[in-house]
A protein has these predicted regions:
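N-terminal/domain-start alpha-helical segments
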Residues: 1-122
Length: 123
């Protein structure tokens, strides 16, 4: 399974990458929304972990553009924005899940497993 991490906090991105690699996922890390969109549009990923407050292009817009391009890769948003309106916006933009920072790594891994498990299922 291959996961794209789009996160501008480099320490968090590296920590996520390390933990996911320990769980036998392949990871790529990009630090801004424009690069994240380019990578995600390649269709090479089983999951995108997407920050919201990103340079160049925010996570909401990245999710919108992915869905407009008919990219169905699951998207899990990770953000400090914890208002209900932000959660609604994220999900309505096309995210499949939304977690607020700080988050529990065990819960994040469970959500990653749930979203990647759905790959290939017929809904």
């Amino acid at each position: 399974m291959r996961i794209l991490i789009v996160e501008d906090e480099s320490h968090l991105a590296e920590t996520l990458g390390q933990i996911l690699r320990e769980q036998h996922y392949q990871t790529d890390i990009v630090n801004d929304g424009a690069d994240g969109l380019d990578y995600a549009l390649s269709g090479q990923y089983d999951l995108v972990l997407l920050g919201v407050m990103l340079p160049k292009l925010d996570g909401f817009e990245v999710a919108r553009r992915l869905r407009a391009a008919h990219i169905s890769t699951p998207v899990l948003m990770l953000t400090a924005r914890d208002e209900t309106g932000d959660k609604i916006t994220g999900l309505d933009c096309g995210a499949d899940d939304y977690m607020t920072k700080p988050f529990d790594m065990g819960e994040l891994l469970a959500r990653v497993r749930a979203l990647t498990r759905r790959q290939g299922e017929v809904l």
